[in-house]
Amino acid sequence: MPSDHPDFRSKSARLRCQPPRTNNCGTFKQPPSVAATSRPKPGNPFLQPPTKGTPPPKKKKKNHTEGCHTHEANPEPNTKHTETEPPIISHCPPPHPGPTATPNLLPCPNPTSSFCQNTRDSPSLPPNVQTWSIFPKHPSKDVTAQVKSQSVSHRAPITYQPPRPTTTSNPRISQSYHMKSISSYLSFAHMNITHTTEQHAENQPHWKTILDIAPFVSITFPAIMCLIFDEDSFEESPFLRFITLLLPFSYSAVQYALLYTNWKSHNKPEPILHTTLYYTLSLLLLAFTIISILSIIPFSLNEWDHAASFFYPIVLPSFTVPPAYLLSSSYFLVPRQIRLTDTVISILISVCSIVNVLLVFKEFNYYPYSAIISSISVLLQLLSEKHCLFKQSPPSTASSRAAVLILTLILAVLVYTFLGYGAIYILDDHFHLLGKMKSILPSEPHQ
């Protein structure tokens, strides 16, 4: 048998002639130790190159995974050579787990990489078949996860399919979402309500202060205007007369209107006596409101002489303001429960109003005293409400307190009857209303 027969060649020569093995990473080169021992040496017939009859090894095409080198030694035992061969050293990444994947396994972000593809050319290794289960990141109770299985061969790469978006059909998720939105809205609404309440609480003392000083200002302001301007100024300027009378008449109109609405808001009494008192007081309050509004224009149009320049700014406010102030602050006007609820200073104000009526029939030199008395009595009333200077009256309806209430109502009726008559007289003097009404009405034929 010739020496160049394949059976007589060395182990290294046979390894050099055999085609290289491939694994998951493609073609691999022999280690330098094996390559060094496989070089032919002169004079050694066993290390000669193969004969011409032996076909050379075919070169395989480089795979995209070339670069991952695995040094593999001869798996068969070498009885002729005593040199040790190195173990298998793999630089490739570990293979991807197969069917034993974890439940929440996410697919490979780059399907074309060497880590995701598993191409095998060796027939000794079976093709790796992987089954991926795709689950949503946020699973819901009602919506089940869809499981997708794909068979991966050594030729076809894995195609990545993203998971479908989950819906909010879960009642717990939707309920929590709505509860969050409602809580945020309620927090904003609570903030808005708190801000409104705090603003109302801050503005309420200011309005209360304005309403408390309104009767005092309504009496003193026209008196100050009378002291500042002379008789000629009031006679020449109707606007100045209007400004002087606007504040006291407006205060009385507003107070009587509020009393009328509060009185009408209560239930109507059933007995005949209470029903009569109920409608009588309602009619009086409504008449006082209308007369206070309509009296501003006629008294402003009238020409003020020397006596009128003291009467309108000083006497009229002391007539109109105290009754309205007493009825709105000192009396509890409720059907079946009408009583005096304030201090004894209310009686003093009623007495001062009667004194003012008596002073009207005297000379105009006493006019300033009526304004001074009314202003002082109202000021004492305001101080008693704020600092409790006088002892409050009991809630029971005594005969004396009922008499004071009746006296106040009679005084108001007399004052506003006088104001109504004066307003009609002034309008008739300017526009001759009575003459026009007589001409319109049919006259009786003369016999």
Curated annotation (Swiss-Prot):
Biased composition (Pro residues): 92-103
Lineage, highest ranks first: Eukaryota, Fungi, Fungi incertae sedis, Microsporidia, Unikaryonidae
Similarity-based family: Belongs to the UPF0328 family.
A Pfam family per the record: DUF2463
Organism for this UniProt entry: Encephalitozoon cuniculi (strain GB-M1) (Microsporidian parasite)
Compositionally biased spans, kind Basic and acidic residues: 1-10, 64-84
InterPro entries associated with the record: UPF0328 (IPR019081)
Residues covered by region (Disordered): 1-103, 147-173
Protein's name according to its UniProt entry: UPF0328 protein ECU10_1870
